[in-house]
């Protein structure tokens, strides 16, 4: 069948019906039931994974009368399967139905109204955006009630806009600018701007996948929501959520094929990914896992700002960045779970997951009011009837974290085996039921404890620097000599509070390898060590800000730190030799700088 353009409001006739409503075209089919989710996993399993979003559309325009500047172009599949109703409020509702095969249409121009997809459960429906602006003050601008998969694709070189101008929507209503009751794929090589004045930006009841396109979403509540999963595979995505989360999932059960639901996955399997999130609440709120990974030889860059970090953006609509209940519209300075000076009880974390957070690559920058990374263990998962693990794992990538609370908080275990973790500001830097650093580079700046655990802290590899206003490294474990275990890492600690210690345990710590240089004011400094004096050297002294304090063994400098503050009556400890000497110099040019002001031989 030759493709042709089907123009809405063209010469197919207007039929008057009761109440001043007009029908154009063909009637809708009966509603179909929602499709069943079949996808959510870290591994790509899309049936169209190799599809080229720069594909040549088969539609060719023929002579037609395009009234009011809006057109529908048939491309492939079921032809002539839409109806258009002019409502008494002046808006059109265009419904695609009666689909008997996978179907593709393109739309262009300006529509004051909404589009409804009712394709049944057997066939994919693809709506191509070819330079379109859709605005509705009464309905969801784009709504897919049924399809096997709903594809929303921005054509290459086009700019497309969807505006939901509705006010508050009833709890029983659909409050999103783009909504799908089935799996939805938002893609293309053009651009798409979505604005919602009342609630969510883009919402899929099942799985939501985004790739390739330039996407901007501005909304009141959640910018991207997939009840079962959200998977970003490539593209340049910017999200603004004035009262909600940037990305959110809800489900924790498994699909009929046994795939775990509730994951948020950000990778680069389809090209470079640049994701920027500005959210009043959580940047990412995953009901199960949150994962960031570099795949396919491409890069991932994620920037998240929450609450105080996101104050510069206002909605391009009647909505504003208003204050949360009990707070003014000006976002104030931060507070946190550990810090009792918090001014709000809402969750304003950077990345939050109710099971685990896994980062295996990418460049991640988070400026959060609450914890930057937070994994819970107090939410029961439907799939297992067990509580989440609460684990956070970093094996590669570069993380830069700023928080008014914990930079990294795991109800379970924190594990860093590679990559670079830089905590620029925090109340407590890293906190977990256990903390393990076996590789990589970890730098922590905190106003209270640098690394804190209710259980064990094991530093077995990599490089660790802690600059803390409280305890440098603090374990509350009650196991003898198991609170802190130094077994291979190079560790430098500077603690500035006289009432705290650079190394603090309840029942002692163990040294079996690596090198440790620790400096703090005199006070709580004599922690029990299960290794004798052959591995420990210490002395008292004063230390001047800007000077390089070093530990030397047999005439070779081992570790050094450029003092960030002056300590008039202090204590310096070196683990690694019982005969180390200490000194101070203006510079240590012969050593390698692994962090700013931290040096190793």
Outline where the language-model segments fall.
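A composition-driven surface/loop motif
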Residues: 2-601
């Amino acid at each position: 069948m030759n493709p042709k353009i089907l123009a809405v409001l063209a010469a197919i006739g207007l039929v008057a019906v009761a109440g001043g409503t007009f029908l154009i075209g063909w009637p809708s089919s009966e509603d179909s039931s929602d499709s069943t989710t079949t996808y959510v996993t870290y591994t790509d399993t899309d049936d169209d994974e190799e599809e080229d979003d720069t594909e040549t559309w088969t539609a060719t325009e023929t002579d037609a009368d395009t009234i009011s500047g809006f057109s529908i172009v048939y491309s492939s599949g079921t032809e002539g399967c839409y109806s258009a109703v002019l409502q008494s409020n002046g808006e059109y509702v265009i419904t695609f139905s009666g689909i008997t095969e996978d179907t593709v249409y393109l739309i262009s121009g300006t529509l004051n109204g909404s589009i409804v997809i009712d394709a049944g459960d057997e066939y994919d429906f693809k709506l191509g955006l070819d330079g379109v602006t859709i605005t509705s003050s009464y309905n969801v601008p784009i709504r897919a009630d049924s399809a096997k998969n709903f594809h929303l694709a921005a054509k290459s070189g086009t700019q497309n806009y969807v505006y939901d101008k509705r006010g508050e929507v009833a709890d029983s209503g659909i409050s999103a600018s783009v909504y799908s009751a089935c799996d939805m794929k938002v893609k293309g090589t053009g651009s798409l701007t979505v604005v919602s004045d009342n609630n969510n930006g883009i919402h899929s009841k099942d799985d939501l996948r985004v790739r390739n396109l330039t996407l901007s979403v501005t909304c009141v509540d959640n910018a991207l929501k997939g009840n079962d999963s959200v998977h970003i595979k490539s593209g340049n995505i910017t999200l603004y959520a004035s009262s909600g989360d940037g990305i959110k999932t809800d489900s924790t059960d498994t699909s009929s094929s046994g795939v775990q639901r509730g994951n948020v996955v950000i990778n680069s399997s389809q090209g470079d990914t640049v994701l920027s999130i500005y959210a009043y609440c959580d940047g990412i709120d995953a009901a199960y896992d949150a994962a960031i990974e570099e795949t396919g030889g491409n890069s991932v860059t994620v920037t998240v700002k929450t609450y105080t970090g996101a104050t510069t953006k206002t909605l391009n609509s009647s909505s504003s960045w208003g204050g949360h209940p009990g707070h003014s519209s000006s976002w104030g300075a931060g507070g946190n779970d550990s810090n009792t000076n918090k001014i709000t009880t809402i969750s304003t974390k950077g990345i939050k997951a109710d099971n685990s957070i896994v980062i295996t690559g990418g460049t991640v920058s988070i400026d959060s009011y609450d914890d930057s990374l937070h994994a819970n263990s107090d939410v029961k998962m439907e799939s297992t009837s067990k509580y989440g693990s609460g684990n956070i794992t970093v094996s590669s990538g570069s993380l830069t974290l700023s928080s008014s609370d914990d930079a990294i908080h795991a109800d379970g275990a924190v594990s860093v085996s590679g990559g670079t973790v830089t905590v620029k500001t925090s109340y407590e830097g890293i906190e977990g039921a256990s903390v393990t650093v076996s590789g990589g580079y970890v730098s922590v700046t905190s106003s209270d404890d640098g690394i804190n655990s209710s259980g064990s802290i094991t530093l077995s590899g990599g490089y660790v620097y802690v600059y803390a206003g409280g305890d440098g490294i603090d374990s509350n474990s009650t196991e003898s000599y198991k609170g802190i275990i130094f077994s291979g890492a190079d560790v430098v600690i500077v603690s500035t509070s006289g009432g705290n210690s650079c190394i603090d345990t309840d029942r002692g710590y163990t040294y079996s390898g690596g090198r440790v240089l620790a400096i703090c004011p005199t006070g709580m400094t004599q922690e029990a060590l299960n290794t004798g004096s052959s591995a420990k050297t210490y002395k008292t002294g004063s230390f001047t800000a800007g000077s390089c304090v070093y530990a030397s063994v047999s005439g070779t400098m081992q570790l050094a730190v450029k003092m960030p503050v002056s300590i008039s009556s202090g204590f310096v400890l070196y683990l690694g030799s019982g005969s180390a000497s200490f000194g101070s110099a203006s510079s240590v040019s012969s050593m390698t700088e692994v962090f700013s002001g931290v040096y190793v031989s």
